[in-house]
């Protein structure tokens, strides 16, 4: 297929596909957990989505049942047997890990006591891809002209789709964006950000950042010391503190 432009919008497969043409896409899937309760007789069908940030939980009504999911600070990378997303895994499920989810489920039962009386109809574990800073990956890739990335939505892809599509289309048509969206521009990353040792450790932290406090200039704690300045050791001896640039 010959074309003038290509948009890579293949979700958690994007990193693997782009690697075949030496393009770096820094994202990787984590395991994402939720449960669906048995029917709860007195649940309000108009119940809004509840978010308990202190306990990393979201809860929403689902056809008379309650769906409870978690964005935990100690996430698990998916597909760790070979660190490759299977080509045919669309809408697939990962093995259950109730021990990992149980502490958050207990907190959910404390928040919504009726949940503890209803039972669990479905325990779900599926892959969801995340980026090194929990921001999108948009724009033309530095390695290949006219190859645009549209992905890395960190579990909020549905709500982001309209705006991301609009930005991508305008970027392709005009060659640039009038607004300052550098925090979403894929060019903010370097090649090493997509290497397995970096990205698989970093996404254990970034999933939880969805429900963490977004302090200004917050520093990540994972995947540090990947690239150091020449006088790093000298500064350590002088008592310096370091941050990610």
Give the positions of each predicted feature.
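A short alpha-helix-loop-beta-strand transition element characteristic
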Residues: 24-27, 51, 117, 178-180, ...
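Long, low-complexity segments enriched in small/aliphatic residues
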Residues: 222-245
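Helical element adjacent to the flavin cofactor pocket in flavoenzyme catalytic cores
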Residues: 1-5, 9, 162, 170
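C-terminal catalytic lobe of FAD-dependent flavoproteins
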Residues: 46, 54, 63, 77, ...
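Pocket-edge structural micro-motifs
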Residues: 38-39, 61, 68-72, 122, ...
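Central helical "cap/lid" subdomain
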Residues: 3-46
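Mid-domain catalytic core of redox enzymes
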Residues: 19-21, 35-77, 96-99
């Amino acid at each position: 297929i010959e074309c003038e432009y290509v948009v890579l919008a293949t979700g958690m497969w994007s990193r693997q596909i782009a690697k075949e043409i030496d393009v770096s896409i820094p994202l990787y899937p984590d395991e994402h957990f939720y449960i669906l309760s048995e029917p709860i007789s007195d649940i309000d069908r108009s119940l809004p989505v509840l978010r308990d940030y202190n306990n990393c939980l979201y809860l929403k009504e689902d056809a008379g049942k309650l769906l409870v999911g978690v964005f935990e600070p100690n996430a698990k990378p998916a597909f760790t047997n070979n660190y490759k997303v299977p080509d045919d895994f669309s809408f697939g499920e990962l093995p259950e890990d109730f021990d990992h989810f149980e502490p958050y489920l207990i907190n959910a039962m404390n928040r919504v006591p009726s949940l503890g009386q209803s039972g669990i109809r479905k325990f779900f574990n599926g892959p969801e891809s995340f980026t090194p800073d929990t921001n999108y990956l948009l724009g033309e890739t530095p390695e290949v002209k006219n190859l645009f990335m549209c992905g890395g939505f960190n579990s909020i892809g549905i709500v982001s789709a309209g705006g991301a599509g609009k930005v991508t289309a305008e970027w392709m048509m005009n060659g640039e964006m009038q607004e300052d969206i550098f925090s979403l521009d894929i060019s903010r990353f370097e090649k090493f950000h997509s290497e397995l040792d970096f990205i698989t450790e970093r996404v254990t932290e970034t999933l939880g950042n969805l429900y963490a406090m977004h302090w200004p200039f917050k520093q990540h704690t994972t995947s540090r010391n990947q690239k150091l300045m020449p006088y790093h050791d000298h500064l350590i001896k002088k008592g310096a503190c370091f941050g990610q640039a």
